[in-house]
Structures are given as C-alpha cells and as structure tokens.
Curated annotation (Swiss-Prot):
It is found in: Cytoplasm. InterPro entries: Phosphoglycerate_kinase, Phosphoglycerate_kinase_CS, Phosphoglycerate_kinase_N, Phosphoglycerate_kinase_sf. The modification Phosphoserine is found at S183. It catalyses: (2R)-3-phosphoglycerate + ATP = (2R)-3-phospho-glyceroyl phosphate + ADP. HAMAP family: Phosphoglyc_kinase (MF_00145). GO terms for molecular function: ADP binding; ATP binding; phosphoglycerate kinase activity. Its EC number is 2.7.2.3. It comes from Priestia megaterium (strain DSM 319 / IMG 1521). GO terms for biological process: gluconeogenesis; glycolytic process. The gene is pgk. This is Phosphoglycerate kinase.
Amino acid sequence: MNKKTLKDIDVKGKRVFCRVDFNVPMKDGKVTDETRIRAAIPTIQYLVEQGAKVILASHLGRPKGEVVEELRLNAVAERLQALLGKDVAKADEAFGEEVKKTIDGMSEGDVLVLENVRFYPGEEKNDPELAKAFAELADVYVNDAFGAAHRAHASTEGIAQHIPAVAGFLMEKELDVLSKALSNPERPFTAIVGGAKVKDKIGVIDHLLDKVDNLIIGGGLSYTFIKALGHEVGKSLLEEDKIELAKSFMEKAKKNGVNFYMPVDVVVADDFSNDANIQVVSIEDIPSDWEGLDAGPKTREIYADVIKNSKLVIWNGPMGVFELDAFANGTKAVAEALAEATDTYSVIGGGDSAAAVEKFNLADKMSHISTGGGASLEFMEGKELPGVVALNDK
C-alpha cells in the first residue's frame, strides 16, 4: 500500500484522533452486533500499548446534523470498555473547550470516545471549520474507518488536511485484500453479484467484467437479466429501464471471454411471506402472477460447483430474500460452498452478504469479511475512496 500506516509513525505521548466505524446495530439502547467494534480493537490496543492518548471518533446512524439521544455513543463506549478490558471515558461533545480540557487531563494509554460526529451538520458537509476543530484536538490522525472511507466528511477527509494522517490496521488490511484481489487475482477468479437492484450494481458489474473469469448473477437483479433473455418474469422485481443494459453486460462478458452465470431455475411464490405457496420453475416458466424470490436447486448446484473450482471469490449481495427462511436456500448454498471450498480465498463484500454468513454461522469459515458495504462496493467499481486519498503518501 502506498499510504503511510500506523507503523510509519511514533505515537508515544501524542494525542491521536482515530476515526473508527462504530456504526453498529442498536436495540433498546443496547449494541446488538459488535463486529465493527471488535474490528477496530487491534488498532486501539496498539495505540494504547504505544502510549498514545487515544481519542476515538465515529458516527452512529443518521441523526442528520442534530442531537438524537438514542444515537449517543455511550452504549458503544461501554461495549468497547468490556472488550478492551480497560476504562474508556466518554465525552458529551465531539470538539470544543470542554473536550480539550478532558484530553489535557488524559494520561498515556487512556482512551476517550467522542460524541457522535454526525450530530454536527458540518460533518457530512465536510465543513473546513469543523475539520479544523477536530484537528485541534490532536497531533496525529489515524483513519481506521474503512466503512466510511467512501465519504468525504470532516472526520474522514477534512481533518487529514491539517495534521499528519495515516491508515489504521483495519483500513490497511481492507485495502490490501481488496486491491490484491482486483489487481493481481489468483485464478480462476469468480465474482458473485446479487442483491435487489441492477442500478446499485452497474459500476461493479461493469468493472468486474474486465477482471474476472466467472461472473455469477443472483438475487432480485437477476430477473432483469432473465427478461433480457426474452423470458417473462411474472411479478418478480424488474427494472424495465435496465433491460438493454443487462443485454450489453451479457455481450461484454462474451467479448471478454467471461463465463456469465445466471439462474436456470428459481423459487417462485404467490405472496411475499414465509407462509406463501411456493414452487420451483425453470426461468422460461415463471407464472404471470407469481414472483421469483430465490435461486432454484439446479442453479444452486451450478453456482456451488463454480465456487469450488475457483481460487478467489468476491461476493457482494444475496441470492434471494434470505431474511425469510423459505427463500434463504440460494444465499445459504453460496455461503456453504464458500465455507467448504478450503482452497478458495473468499472475500465477502460487507452489507447483506456479511449479514448472511453471520446468519448461517459460517463467518469464521470466510477468508475476509469486509466491514464496509458501500466502501467495498465503490472500491470494486474502481473508484478512489476520499478517506484513503486524503492520507499521507509513503
């Protein structure tokens, strides 16, 4: 990686403003999934051991520039304290005189969690004044929030204009894994692109068709491709305005010598619920008043076979409505094939795919689960991430 990282700087006795991604799911004031907090621990632990004054900043949810009581970071700070096994202080603001006083009173190795940075309208606007106010709290900036790296915000990009800025260990690992996968992949290289809408994955499909040996399509977006082949899709999700684009992707795959896999059979239902009547049909025979909600058994077998014969697989987006057990088999089959393919390096691109491997208790069988859904998606589109560009070059 051509950006400076934590190991390139001395942090002893320094005030370190570390941007982490603690945007975790909450319920009734409790953290329900602490994966993102755990992911930041190696960087925080290292800063503590090196004798830095550790100042942690994160967003939580979408408070839209105002204080929302249930989006305060108190519960997150409590979980962090338990995971770190040491005291973690929590500030009521994210900058200003009171926060400065608290930081002045910190000893080497102390940890302070600032208040939710999105309580301030300047954060998402990347307001230079707010970026400066953040920078005044510290001597060094560390960005370990890969999940927010695709945002040019005051705490992810603006602050880096004012003080030395380096990548944390999680950021470094995410970038290393993804850039190695895209620039120097082991082959056969397979990408699995699922999810609901073609429009969200246009850039990814387009970019990956220049890189992969196999492209597997699944989920709601596959019905636009099925329609592009000339088949009726009943009440399935369909983007009429993307049919021509779907055709052009299939042509590009052919031109580039990419094996293009899409469903051959699907699970259709007469209602969007677990109790619906369901049947398996070939893609030529989708009934007019039913909707496709999952990949069928033949499709699952073909996809699993492609996965097991790949050296590298990147997976972004589920194969069906996996939140409903009746339509989870396609997504589960992909997750299980990846878990069983021990010679395959598997990269799970955050978001729903990460949630799926968690749901099926297969997370520990994946080689790398990205902590950033949107960020990994943009990286796979070949876009530069503002939070990374802003860091100091080696």
